Amino acid sequence: MDDKKAGAGVSAEKQKALAAALSQIEKQFGKGSIMRLGDGEIEQDIQVVSTGSLGLDIALGVGGLPRGRVVEIYGPESSGKTTLTLQVVAEMQKLGGTCAFIDAEHALDVQYAGKLGVDVGNLLISQPDTGEQALEITDALVRSGSIDLIVIDSVAALVPKAEIEGEMGDSLPGLQARLMSQALRKLTGTIKRTNCLVIFINQIRMKIGVMFGSPETTTGGNALKFYASVRLDIRRIGSIKKGDEVVGNETKVKVVKNKVSPPFREAFFDILYGQGISRQGEIIDLGVDAKIVEKAGAWYSYNGEKIGQGKDNAREYLRENPDIADEIENKVRLALGVAPLNTVAGAPAEVEG
């Protein structure tokens, strides 16, 4: 009996010591730096912007990408990185936010951005000559306190001035990594204070001679991996066909790192060419999973009313009836404990002196 009491005493002491350690870690490194994976605990009162994908908003645990944070989106070529970020831009603009696009790759398709719902007339765009210029412009925009979202496309295209002015065969190891490390040290605090969301798009490279583990790595050194609150790995996993014609990609996004909610969740959605993420398709799939949309054979119904035979027809019905689509989406969000639509508008930013 005494042994049991002693064991309980030790256990209580351990719990007390653990609570003190967790409190110290949170005080030193910030809220959300450590959490129980099974709890599903998330940082409270966090302002977010939707990604344009219901499944990804749910996988992120807070209903979207967190404001006042650095986010990295990376993946192979043509996997949907720019499409996803342009959808985030469109969502931020719907909330009345001001967005900037730092086009270091000099490859932004304005017409395509318009098709995804981006208000291109009010989108700030910069096509810098060097990596230093791109990051100085980013710093100036963040410090202004008037920008809600900045996209840098891409880290690989942030070429240091010394490399541009040098000869083609010059060896300049670690130059870009040092540039990124310095910029992020400077930017992070300001980003938090001004409540600006900064998204870095990144490319994948292969490490030579890797025998075990993944040979893939992202460009620009390790600094971004540390400073990013959210890291998303986006991949194309299949094609969507209409007859013999390929009309889109099946896409998977894995939340590789998440400081505001438990990580490692995945989201699957369709990206349709010329339209972007198929929001209606996701609403149908997640609505069926949450038993909000009924599926009997090939027919889909909502509130006892048939909305289409086959997914394509149901998708078309929701496209023609956006109010019903919003209603179903909000019910799905509510069922899964995620913030409903149009409740994620940010507070006014703080202007840097």
From Swiss-Prot:
PROSITE patterns reported for this sequence: RECA_1, RECA_2, RECA_3
Positions annotated to bind ATP: G75, P76, E77, S78, S79, G80, K81, T82
Record keywords: ATP-binding, Cytoplasm, DNA damage, DNA recombination, DNA repair, DNA-binding, Nucleotide-binding, SOS response
Function: Can catalyze the hydrolysis of ATP in the presence of single-stranded DNA, the ATP-dependent uptake of single-stranded DNA by duplex DNA, and the ATP-dependent hybridization of homologous single-stranded DNAs. It interacts with LexA causing its activation and leading to its autocatalytic cleavage.
Biological process terms in GO annotation: DNA recombination; DNA repair; SOS response
This protein's name: Protein RecA
GO cellular component: cytosol
Origin: domain of life: Bacteria
Alphabetized InterPro entries for the sequence: AAA+_ATPase, DNA_recomb/repair_RecA, DNA_recomb/repair_RecA_CS, P-loop_NTPase, RecA-like_C, RecA-like_N, RecA_ATP-bd, RecA_C_sf
UniProt organism field: Cupriavidus metallidurans (strain ATCC 43123 / DSM 2839 / NBRC 102507 / CH34)
Entries under Pfam families matching the protein: RecA, RecA_C
GO molecular function: ATP binding; ATP hydrolysis activity; ATP-dependent DNA damage sensor activity; damaged DNA binding; single-stranded DNA binding
Family: Belongs to the RecA family.
Localization per Swiss-Prot or TrEMBL: Cytoplasm
Principal location: cytoplasm
